[in-house]
Amino acid sequence: MASSMISSATIATVNCSSPAQANMVAPFTGLKSASAFPVTRKANNDITSLASNGGRVQCMQVWPPLGKKKFETLSYLPDLTPVQLAKEVDYLLRSKWIPCLEFELEEGFVHRKYSSLPTYYDGRYWTMWKLPMFGCTDSAQVLEELENCKKEYPNAFIRIIGFDNVRQVQCISFIAYKPKGY
């Protein structure tokens, strides 16, 4: 009903607009032709002209899948020396993470014994050695606790984890000790 209430004077004003007013903005004429720009493409279909490493790398051997159990981060490396362990713990402390020691007496490697659900990343549950080391500022304290755990459980896998108490997540985890034969 509102459309029927427009006066005839308004209709006359709309009809009086000149064609010059409708063309005040220049129309979009599109992008420029690609032929206006110089072409610098190399017309070579030879596959050997693609990226190369200069022939420095030939065939690389893959990691043998048999007899190599995966434990934790850095498990593909040889066992860490006490100096290397101290450097890892120093990194953990510099990152403001809380060090904690955990041990496992049966299977220190990844398995799906308890659950195949994706709720826990590998189905393992480790026992905590004492409490997390809140307030620890020196890697020697952590390594001393590692030695105490080794004396108490010589046949256990022992790992050091770094816990971020702000985000409440485990940020780092690596094997610090493996029993003989692993």
From Swiss-Prot:
Alphabetized GO MF terms: ribulose-bisphosphate carboxylase activity
One Pfam family linked to the record: RuBisCO_small
Keywords assigned: Calvin cycle, Carbon dioxide fixation, Chloroplast, Photorespiration, Photosynthesis, Plastid, Transit peptide
Record localization: Plastid, Chloroplast
Organelle targeting sequence: 1-58
SUPFAM superfamilies named among the record's database cross-references: RuBisCO, small subunit
Complexes and interactors: Heterohexadecamer of 8 large and 8 small subunits.
Family to which the UniProt record says this protein belongs: Belongs to the RuBisCO small chain family.
Name of this chain's protein: Ribulose bisphosphate carboxylase small subunit, chloroplastic
